[in-house]
């Protein structure tokens, strides 16, 4: 994760610190994805949970504004296929399958299967 992305999300946090209702649900989901990556040190910008389909537009818009070019989706919910279609409807494209690496709770490298999405 580069400094542009960190600065964007940190500014988002600071600007909404006293009133999270200023942010849309999709923007909050994007911020929580950023937080997940800070806490898990994934090898790629990992998205372990996509937003509700109704919030996908704001989620993608926020990620693009932050400078995120690709996400590695590790979500395994039953809504995954529908979410992939919603991402495609936002102009995103599936680059293919990938494997992300992040430390487990003991600090050992753990591989997780993912789908790499280009946010275009």
Predicted feature residues:
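Functionally constrained cores in energy, signaling, and assembly domains
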Residues: 34, 88, 113
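N-terminal leader/targeting segments
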Residues: 1-82
């Amino acid at each position: 994760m580069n400094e542009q992305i960190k600065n964007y999300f940190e500014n988002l946090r600071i600007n909404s610190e006293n009133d999270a209702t200023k942010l849309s649900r999709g923007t909050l989901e994007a911020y929580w994805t950023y937080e997940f990556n800070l806490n898990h040190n994934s090898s790629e910008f990992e998205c372990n949970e996509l937003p509700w389909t109704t919030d996908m537009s704001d989620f993608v818009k926020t990620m693009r504004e932050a400078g995120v070019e690709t996400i590695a989706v590790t979500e395994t919910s039953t809504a995954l296929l529908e979410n992939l279609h919603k991402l495609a409807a936002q102009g995103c494209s599936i680059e293919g399958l990938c494997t992300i690496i992040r430390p487990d709770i003991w600090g050992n490298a753990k591989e997780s299967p993912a789908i790499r999405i280009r946010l275009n």
